[in-house]
Structures are given as structure tokens and as C-alpha cells.
Amino acid sequence: MPTFSALATAAYCPRQLYYRRRDPPDGTPAAAERAYDLSTHYPELVVASDTALRTFDLAVSPATYRRRLRALRERDCWQTLTDPPESDALVEGRDCRGRVQKVGYDPLRPVLVSPGDPADSGVWEPQRVRAVAAALALAWRERTPVESALVEYPRHGVVREVRLTAGNRALYRRTLRAVEGLDGPPPRLRDTARCGSCDYRAECGTKTRSLRSLL
């Protein structure tokens, strides 16, 4: 059964998933562990001094961070973020399974913690696929509909909602079919910025070209 992580990887690049399946990474990345730990301290961080906040790995200034946490405190997700009924839960659905960092009950929805940077607006496609997968798995476990998921970026003090719209469900289903049909290395991506940050770029052999070379 595919994991949430495998689906997110396939949404980013199916070939990257092939390499990860062949050579699985060891354990949870340290950056992910630090991000989750940071996300458990919001009640203290929202009132912390600049000096105290500078001791944490934040992606924004202390003033911006406090302002964003104060805005989060006014949202209905604050209780779930700071005192979730479930945390680090293994959720198994009909088609996929994986770990959910936090689970809220009112409303029922999963929260996925990301160590990375948020998109300028909305949620990155791989994270949307992962969020939909987690929401559907949670709905299967609880035998009740789940309408949304949250993606949390603790280093930025940002939380984005992913609704289970028809478009997001379709994106998830396409990715699930791609993962289930993966047999051997998929075709390489060509001339994409995604390859530049890939750990398997050298092994994959994908070549990216500059604008100068294209001209």
C-alpha cells in the first residue's frame, strides 16, 4: 500500500520515487523533526522576546513570526495546532497509509508539518497530494467525511488549508495510479527546475539547460 510520502514524491517526480524505493533513506530527516518540535511550542513562542526567538531556526524575523502566530491564535485551528487530540498518528486508509503529525477532531482533519517554505499562495502540488491522501485515509479510518487538511510551516508561522475539491481529488487519483503502476524507472523529466534540487540528479542523468544554451 503506498505511503503518503511516496505519493508526494511521485507528484514531484515519479523517477525520484523509483530511486527512493530502490535506496530507501534512513529514518526521518532531521529538518522534519526540528520543524515538528518547533510546532509544539507556539504558546510560548507567540509571547517570546526577539532574543528568545532568535535561538530558534526561524525563516522570518521575530516580529513577523510573532505577528503570524497571533493571527493563527485567532483561527479555529489554534487548538488543534497547540493541543491536538492525536499526534504522530499512523493512519491507514483504503488506498494508502502514513503518519500524520497532528489530528484535529472539531472539525476532523489531519495536519501535516513541513520543514520547508510555503508557496506564495496555496500549497505546493506534492503537499496537496499528501494532504488529500491523509484526509481520505483519516475519513476511511473514522468512517466519516473529512473536508480538508492543514499544511503547517512552523519555521514561517504559516498554516495553509487544502480543501478536498474535485480538482485536488483528481490530482490525488492520478498520482495514486502512477504510483501503483510504477514498474521500472519512469521517463526522465526534461529541463525542469525540479531536477536542480534533486538528490538523484547525477545518477538520473537529467540535463538542465540554461537560457543561453537554448538560444
Regions from the language model: what does each represent?
Residues 181:
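Long C-terminal interaction/binding lobes of large macromolecular proteins
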Residues 1-108, 208-215:
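Metal-dependent nuclease catalytic cores that hydrolyze phosphodiester bonds in DNA/RNA
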